[in-house]
Amino acid sequence: MTKYIFVTGGVASSVGKGITVASLGRLLKSRGISVSIQKLDPYINVDPGTMSPYQHGEVFVTEDGAETDLDLGHYERFIDENLSRVNNITTGQIYSSVIQKERRGDFLGGTIQVIPHITNEIKSRVALVAKNTNADVVIVEIGGTVGDIESLPFLEAIRQMKKDVGRDNVMYIHVTLLPYLQASGELKTKPTQHSIAELRRVGISPAVVLCRSDLPVDDDMREKIALFADLPNEAVVALPTVDSIYEVPLVLEEAGLGDLIIERLALAAQPVQLDEWRSLVARIKQPKRHTTVAIVGKYVELRDAYMSVAESVRHAGWAQDIQVDIKWVSSEELEVADPVTMLGDVQGIIVPGGFGYRGVEGKIRAVRYARENKIPFLGLCLGMQCATIEFARFALNAPDANSTEFNPNTKLPVIDFMPDQLDISDKGGTMRLGVYPCILAPDTKAAKAYGRELALERHRHRFEFNNKYRKAMEAAGFVISGHSPDGRLVEIVELRDHPWFVASQFHPEFKSRPNNPHPLFRDFVQAALEQIAE
């Protein structure tokens, strides 16, 4: 029978609950236990697909085309498993489903209430993960903090799960913050005590309390929290801030949390195998070489908007004992600034995805700088479209070249709406989403990177390369190195006369893993390092 671990948060949001959950998954998987992880988001949006990156950060796309919370990216990277749309549930999805059932008459005229109808729907979504994956353990993160009004139905649902599946099959873990008061020079436990009391008020008693802090937590403080929480001292685990998020599984393992979970849930575990993870952390801490690459985007003030891109760059570096320093460059500032001033000190340039015209001309200037100065370049989604526009404007001498996203009346639409997107009015969940096959052209940089003829990559876009201009572009040195199986959709482009210039319509960053970097990022970082040697 599947066991469940429910992870709640207290005192403050953004304390690293998602990383903690992902790390728990890694600890269990390192013991031969199959794991799946689910995120319950209390917001009323159906999904984050139409939310501003400034409010939500990155939208992470799963293999089956779900637009999900960025924490799912952490989950996939830590447990090295592909997740699906059932792994991210929102209040919007829950209420939409219940209302649809009521309209169909599924409730036989009954009065629809939060309890039992909403809570039953939540529980059914949690159970669906276990059914679909047959995992030994499903770890469920409840978004937000205890005390948030939006979270109450989710807390009630996970409280009921203990009765539904048996108390021996459920474990509650509470992640809380120990704030530091500079005036008194100490960490304070009172907010954590109140958070635990609030959790108990809704009928949940945590079996483990994880204490996040920027400073070490001494034994006396842990004992104080354990006394208040009615827990053994070893069930209060200190989780201080570390240099790399990939250290967290090792910190938790050293604290004995892995064994504690195994004992509490009576899991049949193999001896722990974390040697590969320890080797990863050692490479992170002791790089042999360094290089700097720029990420040019319009959301660089909130780096969470490019979470998977940044992580993929780092993965590629660590695999080659390289520390990749990221220079964040505002594409809006680059529209008016000298590119040499902003990009002259980097060995590689990435233009990631995005939507809307704001900052696009700055991205195009970054592409031009990379092309003309032979700087390694990687374009992602919109970055590929910007590379297409730049080449048409400045290599083909077609200054009017543009995308119909930015200028619907452009005379040279080298990027245009996909035909099946023309009649779509709803914005949410209607793009070309999820994994699609890509045929790689032989003797290209893309084919060399992948080492095979077929790639399966995740997409999130409405616009595509306009094949009307394909022959003219190719004649000038623009290489179509990847396309859909029917040959109609351009998936990867590169330049013939450039050391390393590759751009993809898909999002390779969603498939990179810390111990298995994506081949396009790997070769991009290698090309950037070679710039230093030159």
Swiss-Prot record:
Coiled-coil portions: none
Keyword Nucleotide-binding recorded: yes
A GO BP entry: 'de novo' CTP biosynthetic process
Residues where ATP binds: S14, V15, G16, K17, G18, I19, D71
Sequence positions that bind Mg(2+): D71, E141
PROSITE patterns to which the protein is assigned, alphabetical: GATASE_TYPE_1
Ranges where the Glutamine amidotransferase type-1 domain occurs: 292-534
Catalytic activity: UTP + L-glutamine + ATP + H2O = CTP + L-glutamate + ADP + phosphate + 2 H(+); L-glutamine + H2O = L-glutamate + NH4(+); UTP + NH4(+) + ATP = CTP + ADP + phosphate + 2 H(+)
The keyword ATP-binding is annotated on this UniProt entry: yes
Record EC number: 6.3.4.2
Start and end residues of each stretch annotated as Amidoligase domain: 1-267
SUPFAM superfamilies: Class I glutamine amidotransferase-like, P-loop containing nucleoside triphosphate hydrolases
Signal peptide: none
Pathway: Pyrimidine metabolism; CTP biosynthesis via de novo pathway; CTP from UDP: step 2/2
Ligand binding (CTP): S13, D148, I149, E150, K188, T189, K190, P191, T192, Q193, K224
Alphabetical keyword list: ATP-binding, Glutamine amidotransferase, Ligase, Magnesium, Metal-binding, Nucleotide-binding, Pyrimidine biosynthesis
Annotated active site: C381 (nucleophile), H507, E509
Family, per entry: Belongs to the CTP synthase family.
HAMAP family: PyrG
PANTHER family membership: CTP SYNTHASE (PTHR11550), CTP SYNTHASE-RELATED (PTHR11550:SF0)
Subunit structure: Homotetramer.
Protein name: CTP synthase
Organism of this sequence: Herpetosiphon aurantiacus (strain ATCC 23779 / DSM 785 / 114-95)
Name of the gene encoding the protein in the UniProt record: pyrG
